Amino acid sequence: MFQNYAATYYNPLYDMNQTNFEETKTTGFTNNFEVDWRVIDELRVRGRFGLTKSNEQMKKFRSPFNTEFNSQADIANKGSYEERNTQNLNYDGDFSLTYGKLFNEKHMVNVVGGMRLSQNGSNNSAYKVQGFIDDEFSNPAFALGYQKDGNATYQDSKKRAVSYYLNFGYAYDDRYLLDVNYRSDGSSVFGSDRQFTNTWSVGLGWNIHKEAFFSDIEGISLLKLRASIGNPGNQNFDDYISTRIYTYNTDNMNIFGSSAIVSNLGNRNLEWQKTLDRNIGFDIIFLDNRLRVNFDYFNKRTDPLLVQIGTASSTGVKTLPRNVGKQITEGITLTMNYSIIRREDMFWSVNMNLRHQTSEYKEVSEVLTKYNLDNRNRNLTRYYDGGSPSDLWAVRSCGIDPATGREIFLDKNGEQTFVHNYDDEVVVGNSDPKVEGVIGTSFYYKGFSASINLRYRLGGQIFMQTLYDKVENLSSSKKWENLDKRALYDRWKQPGDQAKFKSIASSEVTPISSRFVEDNNVLSGESISLGYESTAPWLKHIGASSMSVRAYMNDIFRISTVKNERGLSYPFARSVSFSLGVTF
């Protein structure tokens, strides 16, 4: 640390030598009990019950000597200790009857009926104290008190669900296939008047290669057409999203005790978010079983959507869950696998898959207008008819004016201006890739094995949050802190500079624009493995029959068109592991 007439500078390595710690301890218990009774050859009864309990404790201590507390003159505000405790208790169970029989050697019938129930419970408590005289005493008992206006917190939540289902499958001569599924699901997440919903699906299949007319066609060993339609439900929402919740207001006591305020309005008519899912595809194997291809086209229509809508300030809450509009998603998936070498002692294959999809909003209500207006200067997401959930909305930018160092914008009429106006917002990108998937290869030779899988992402854009926060939008005080070097070297400084970032002398807030949106193409080493398995005679001397050694690497590299700092996020994890297995 050193000082000059302008400011005080801190070495970020100084805090590393202080007594700081953050640790998390987790314990868990899981038990599953299952009963399986085959009453007769065709009838089977199964029951299962599972219980999971876990406890997690987080402790975090910040030394009073850390530089973050240098601005605090009162010792009661220096140093802090935080503790959070979470207890989870979950159970689930199901009961089913299964019947399957082949009639007249051509009619295969399978019927499954049953029910399932579950409960997810969570208990959370936390507190934070401050004021430590010395970092040798990190026990919270040595703290001088709670944070100003800070209290201990406590939350208890439960989510329950129950479902009843009936599945029917029929196959005629292994050529024509039919699957019918029906479910009735209930969940405490949704409104008391709409807690149950019915979901269904129907699937058809045709094994063309089983037909008599196909027997003369050589080179194709399997050809199957598939089609399905159904409406699966979605209950991945907050436990009490539809329930009115009151919070005790301990800051305003009266003669009757503590007051209560509404923290969640709830909605007793809140419906399940339903999706009509349609799919058609085919499977084919040919070239002497060397090439396998699977193709699917899907179309998903979600109606209604479940959206948090902004409310008037007089209600006392910021948002209210409502069912609004529709979303249509369609796309394709393709998987291919080709066996280049296929021998008893050697095998080599290559594989690839890809996915492409687009989404669009339909019949979006005007109630989302306030949401769009409130989020103009916060993010790039908007709800508009015909828009996509992954569209990036911003004002178009022509870059930095070399003469003045100011940003030049394009309005909706295509004219250049120095004035940023949110009414000129247009779609400047889409966060979804044009296509993404995995390409890989597998090799085996006399006990040696190797596999490589690379994940790719082509097309799509990303908002450069680090550039927006750490290179521009810097206050006068932050200019003296440790910053991205581009905040100093890549800014406009004098007339004629061809700079990517605005004038270094400007401290005005930079609005969101397309200047911070870049193409995001990625290639990463998703998984790489090497192994060797041996059944050598010498293993018998130690009583073993086989031995295997393997090495695994996950996300070992990442190549991207985006050069972006991770900020406060964790770096991309690169893991390397080894395993040794011996079979006796």
Where are the model-predicted features located?
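Outer-membrane beta-barrel signature, preferentially recognizing the C-terminal barrel domain
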Residues: 17-20, 144-165, 231, 251-292, ...
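Extracellular loop and loop/strand-boundary signature of outer-membrane beta-barrel proteins
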Residues: 16-21, 30, 34, 76-84, ...
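Outer-membrane beta-barrel transmembrane domain signature of Gram-negative proteins
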Residues: 63, 74-175, 229, 241, ...
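Extracytoplasmic gating/loop element in the C-terminal half of outer-membrane beta-barrel translocons
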Residues: 14, 69, 146, 187, ...
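C-terminal beta-signal and terminal closure region of outer-membrane beta-barrel proteins
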Residues: 247, 324-331, 372-405, 488-491, ...
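Surface-exposed extracellular loop regions of Gram-negative outer-membrane beta-barrel proteins
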Residues: 25-104, 159-191, 195-210, 275-277, ...
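Surface-exposed loop/turn segments flanking beta-strands in extracellular/periplasmic regions
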Residues: 1-15, 60-79, 123-152, 242-266, ...
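Conserved small-residue
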Residues: 126-128, 322, 339-431, 462
